[in-house]
Amino acid sequence: MNVSRPSGRQADALRPVRIERAFTCHAEGSVLVSFGNTLVVCTASVEAKVPVFLRNKGEGWVTAEYGMLPRSTHTRSEREAARGKQAGRTLEIQRLIGRALRTCVDRTALGERTITLDCDVLQADGGTRTAAITGAYVALVDAVRCLEQRGQLKKSPLIGAVAAVSVGIYRGMPVLDLDYPEDSDCDTDMNVVMNDEGGVIELQGTAEQQAFRRGELDMLLALAERGTAMLFDIQREALAR
């Protein structure tokens, strides 16, 4: 099927992805991650405490918060703080980020401390949650390295890498890493979180206009595997700098 993507990319191509470490000066880990025009700041903050349900259990915790700046989108959105509550979408995404990052941490090795990943969207052009997960992992690694440099860890609690990417069916064609024009006009939209051993951590898939078939699902998962493999390479390159 000869279908052109609005960006001109091939069906299996990511947008340009960049990860800039040490983006802020206070947090133990911080990055600016960009997927094309989507920009997210991810910071990792370490606190010597755990939630009540983990007190005196010898385990740590990894959690996340997510938010979008008022003009990160085409029109201004009111700050959630001004409304007095978080939107359902915000809660869903920050829980997803926290779940994803906990899978790559040995919480016993972390000890009784909490690492909070704050993911703030500066500019949204599709795929903010997948960009946040991919960037937050790098911030998490830097926070762990900081603890190691301080002599506060006996061993690294990291047990793998995590990345996420969107896939979808756009005008009948399976595509990788949807931007906003594709995301707003696709037949199927799916977010895939994976680890660097090829394991699937989470799938969020929705048929927007018409149902998708098993064969199409398999093609989307294959695209997601390809995309996350490229993202793991980008993460490793960023962490080596």
Swiss-Prot record:
**CDD domains, A to Z:** RNase_PH_bact (cd11362)
Q: Does the keyword Zinc apply?
A: no
Q: Give binding positions for phosphate.
A: R89, G127, T128, R129
> What protein name applies here?
Ribonuclease PH
Q: Which HAMAP family does its entry note?
A: RNase_PH
What does this chain do? Phosphorolytic 3'-5' exoribonuclease that plays an important role in tRNA 3'-end maturation. Removes nucleotide residues following the 3'-CCA terminus of tRNAs; can also add nucleotides to the ends of RNA molecules by using nucleoside diphosphates as substrates, but this may not be physiologically important. Probably plays a role in initiation of 16S rRNA degradation (leading to ribosome degradation) during starvation.
How this chain assembles, per its entry, is:
Homohexameric ring arranged as a trimer of dimers.
Instruction: Give yes or no: UniProt keyword Transferase.
Output: yes
Give the catalysed reaction(s), semicolon-separated.
tRNA(n+1) + phosphate = tRNA(n) + a ribonucleoside 5'-diphosphate
Gene Ontology annotations of biological process type: rRNA catabolic process; rRNA processing; tRNA processing
